């Protein structure tokens, strides 16, 4: 299934960049892979983001084979997943257990932190209203998103910028299980809750649940994994 160059515009990811050059975000890959599902809710397993695509005009192809989906750019595979039934059950790891706030950032501070480690977002993806980190390594994110890709990306942004004070840039590299109630429409307001399940200097992992204002579960990301990348801060590196 050919994906037209307008795909990036439709997902609202024009201008999304890491280290100064545009790149299709992890949430964009999840949405592209979800488009192949015929049932709702959508269940994706073992999603892997293998290679970044930095050319918004690059021809992408979505291929399906016995429950496996892949997005390809030319001869290279960029993202893969398996399909599975979706139950949208509550993730125990995302249940709030602590009320002691260690850190809190409003929208302006959050995006300054992102920019300080080379993470810049188009207007559609500037959807984080507030981020709170708690003493038990859990977090919450208030989200106002116009697209499903932005909705999914909001809590990922919070984790990517977690270590901004040390100048560390993290990017998503995979999700063990992603479930979406509706892959086509995003609620106007949502709250993401999550918890770090692993953290080292080189990698992070977490579970995330997204709910509407009335508490309806709309998406879960279980086993989201992040890797630290080479210094992407503005002006970093030789001659920077």
Q: What positions do the PLM features span?
A:
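Acyl-thioester-processing domains in fatty-acid/polyketide/NRPS systems
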Residues: 1-240
């Amino acid at each position: 299934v050919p994906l037209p160059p307008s795909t990036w515009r439709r997902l609202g990811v024009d201008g999304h960049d890491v280290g100064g050059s545009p790149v299709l975000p992890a949430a964009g890959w999840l949405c592209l892979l979800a488009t192949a599902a015929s049932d709702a809710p959508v269940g994706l397993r073992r999603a892997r983001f293998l290679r970044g695509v930095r050319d918004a005009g690059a021809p992408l192809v979505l291929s399906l084979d016995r429950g496996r989906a892949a997005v390809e750019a030319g001869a290279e595979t960029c993202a893969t997943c398996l399909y599975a039934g979706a139950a949208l059950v509550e993730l125990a790891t995302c249940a709030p257990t602590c009320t002691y706030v260690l850190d809190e950032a409003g929208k302006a501070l959050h995006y300054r932190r992102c920019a300080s480690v080379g993470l810049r977002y188009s207007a559609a993806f500037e959807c984080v209203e507030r981020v709170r980190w708690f003493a038990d390594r859990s977090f919450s994110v208030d989200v106002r998103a116009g697209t499903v890709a932005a909705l999914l990306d909001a809590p990922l942004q919070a984790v990517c910028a977690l270590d901004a004070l040390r100048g560390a840039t993290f990017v998503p590299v995979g999700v063990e299980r992603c479930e979406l109630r509706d892959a086509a429409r995003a609620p106007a307001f949502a709250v993401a809750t999550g918890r770090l399940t692993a953290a080292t200097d080189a990698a992070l992992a977490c579970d995330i649940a997204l709910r509407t204002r009335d508490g309806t579960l709309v998406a879960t990301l279980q086993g989201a994994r992040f890797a630290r990348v080479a210094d992407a801060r503005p002006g970093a590196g030789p001659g920077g």
